[in-house]
Amino acid sequence: MGFFRQLFSLSLCALSLAIPSKLIGLENTQDVIPNSYIVVMKSTISEAEFQTHQAWASKIHRRNLGERDGTLGGLDGLKTTFEFEGLKGYSGAFDKRTIELISRNPAVDYVEVDRVVKLDAITTQRNAPSWGLGRISHKSAGSSDFVFDDSAGSGITIYGVDTGIDIKHPEFSGRATWGTNTVDNEDTDQNGHGTHTAGTFAGATYGIAKKANVIAVKVLNAQGTGSTSGVIQGIQWCTDHAGRNGLRGKAAMNLSLGIRGSTVFNRVAEAAQQSGIFLAVAAGNDGTDAAQFSPASARGVCTAAATNSQDAATSWSNYGSVVAVYGPGADIVSAYPNEDTATLSGTSMASPHVCGVGAYLMALEGIGPDKVCDRIKELAVESVTNQKPNTTRKLLYNGSGA
């Protein structure tokens, strides 16, 4: 019997070698995590077939390592799986021989190299004045008053997928809770970026959706870096949590992070949006076309570029046809860990403005996540100067009438 099992295993390997490799993302060598991969299955695969494939991949991994030197050598094999509507896959650490066989397996759609994900913030300045709230609640620049409806995001839950959030910060008035951590064992914001973005989309003083609930989803470490696979885990947790708790259709997510174009990252972002969560994402800070970055180029998400207080597109903001709207992104003051405040700049700061307005409109107008970005674009004002190629001039506006 063992002979036939061995023969079957060898037959699978031979079949795999007859199929072209489906490794992608190799052209983006920047920030690649060595020997780490994300495997995406074909959309037609059943749950039973997915389980069988995982067992096969793990067996091939163990066999190849055993033939090499008998040690793992940091190559742990299959680590985590993810499942969205029409999208299944897993991530892991494999040697080149194993991942080549996996990529040729008939059940596999493609394999993408795992890469380092970074924040989209660029500068820090302590305790500077903010201007973003006044700007997004008036059709013209110049006012420091924030005009908004008292519903203020009530009944909406916002997932901050970031460096974590200081959930005890007074800005959140008991509305913030810890969700999950896919990057380390420190369930706190050791960087500050996640607390800052959350303060913008839902803080009591510096925020837009002041009555929304906030959930911290930590996918980036103290240095502001993580992995594509770790971010996918975090997004998976959000969609599962929203489903279990009846929050689909009443939830938003902020993604102030990104990498060079990733097919799997875009597909996961699209799946999360389609599951009933409004996604606001940062365009990036490379001063180039945002279509080259993920999740900025994902379909259906609301991609935010950045302006300064004079309504000019910043020199560092990415741009292009994937940008849905501009938002305040230069010198934005917001919450910071340990009851502090700080001022940051970047499309990381524009995105939570869009996320906050999205949550605000969901509560105020009762619109679904799939309609929010269109509504944001409908309300936005044509006021952005220093226009970039093939890019909207629309600036975020909450429709207050001011």
From Swiss-Prot:
A cellular component term from Gene Ontology for this protein is: extracellular region
**Which organism's genome codes for this protein?**
Arthroderma benhamiae (strain ATCC MYA-4681 / CBS 112371)
Q: Where is the signal peptide?
A: 1-20
The protein's name is Subtilisin-like protease 9
Enzyme Commission no: 3.4.21.-
Q: Which family does it belong to?
A: Belongs to the peptidase S8 family.
* Keywords from the UniProt entry: Glycoprotein, Hydrolase, Protease, Secreted, Serine protease, Signal, Virulence, Zymogen
This protein's record includes keyword Transit peptide: no
